[in-house]
């Protein structure tokens, strides 16, 4: 994706740098946690590494959802005439209410997915606990997903390209005009292409 659209690479890595660094550190923490959790016969030691494993799984799931929420709202950047891109936001600006809601949707969906996998691969107490958490995560996913959809329809401003799409030449964002400031714009695609409604309906 980044090779096809280098502008996307430039904006995302400059704007989401701290967020991506947090994801990277969390992903590094997971294999370390699995390796060192059983190194000592101590309940406190194991509990500490259990929390490390939790952080290593929770942070990437949350931040990936937060990133998607910010993409839906629009990322604050500007493009110079010489095609230089400047990000004008900050890390804490990414943690806005709608983006955090999208982060929670991501966490709930991944917990549901992980719980379903454990139910299939284990039995006994582990499978029973995974089933209980999977049901809770599924209910949370449905509720949070619905709330996010209502906000996208009524509150969050969408974006729509109003200029002609030239598919026979190189991409130049300076030649495009975008309409924003109208809530529900993201749902216009469902009206233009009704078959796309199958995607959210199928989950």
PLM features: residue spans?
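Membrane helical hairpin/interfacial module
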Residues: 1-36
């Amino acid at each position: 994706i980044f090779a096809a659209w280098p502008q996307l690479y430039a904006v995302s890595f400059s704007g989401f740098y701290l967020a991506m660094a947090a994801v990277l550190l969390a992903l590094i923490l997971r294999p370390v946690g699995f390796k060192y959790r059983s190194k000592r016969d101590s309940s406190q030691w194991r509990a500490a590494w259990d929390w490390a494993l939790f952080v290593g799984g929770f942070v990437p799931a949350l931040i990936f959802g937060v990133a998607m929420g910010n993409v839906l709202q629009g990322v604050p950047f500007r493009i110079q005439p010489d095609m230089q891109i400047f990000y004008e936001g900050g890390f804490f600006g990414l943690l806005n209410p709608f983006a955090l809601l999208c982060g929670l949707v991501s966490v709930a969906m991944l917990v549901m997915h992980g719980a379903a996998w454990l139910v299939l691969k284990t039995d006994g107490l582990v499978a029973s606990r995974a089933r209980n958490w999977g049901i809770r995560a599924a209910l949370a996913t449905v509720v949070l997903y619905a709330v996010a959809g209502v906000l996208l329809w009524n509150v969050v401003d969408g974006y729509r390209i109003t200029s002609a799409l030239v598919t026979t030449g190189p991409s130049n964002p300076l030649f495009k005009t975008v309409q924003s400031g109208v809530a529900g714009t993201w749902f216009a695609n469902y009206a233009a292409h009704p078959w796309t409604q199958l995607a959210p309906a199928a989950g």
